[in-house]
């Protein structure tokens, strides 16, 4: 690989590595509906691997707990069935999230302090 190609490859790799540090949810031209908010949440959790070492995302279900003019609040629950295991009569809460309609900002309910925190995958894992 010649010097210029190596430099370009290193620059691209460096850009890809630091982009998530500066990436913030962009203001949306239109507000999210419930399906869009849930899709954003699922995509974000999957991309960040928040539950990769805790539970398969195939073994969770999402439910809408609250809808306001500002946000949708979702609950993430364990899915107990033959494939995922567990008592099928229960579906314990894993976490709760709010997705804001206009900004796409995500918040997570920190259960010990019982307050809403900005989404930070490192704190949730």
Question: What residue spans do the PLM features occupy?
Answer:
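Short, solvent-exposed loop/turn elements at domain surfaces
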Residues: 49-50, 82-86, 107-108
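C-terminal partner/receptor-binding element of secreted or periplasmic proteins
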Residues: 105-125
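Bacterial N-terminal signal peptides
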Residues: 10-20
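Exposed beta-strand-loop-beta-strand "reactive/processing" segments of non-cytosolic proteins
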Residues: 56-100
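Bacterial N-terminal signal peptides that target proteins for export
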Residues: 2-12
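Short, non-transmembrane alpha-helical segments in secretory-pathway proteins
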Residues: 26-61
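Eukaryotic scaffold repeat domains enriched in small/polar residues
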Residues: 45-50, 67-68, 72, 76, ...
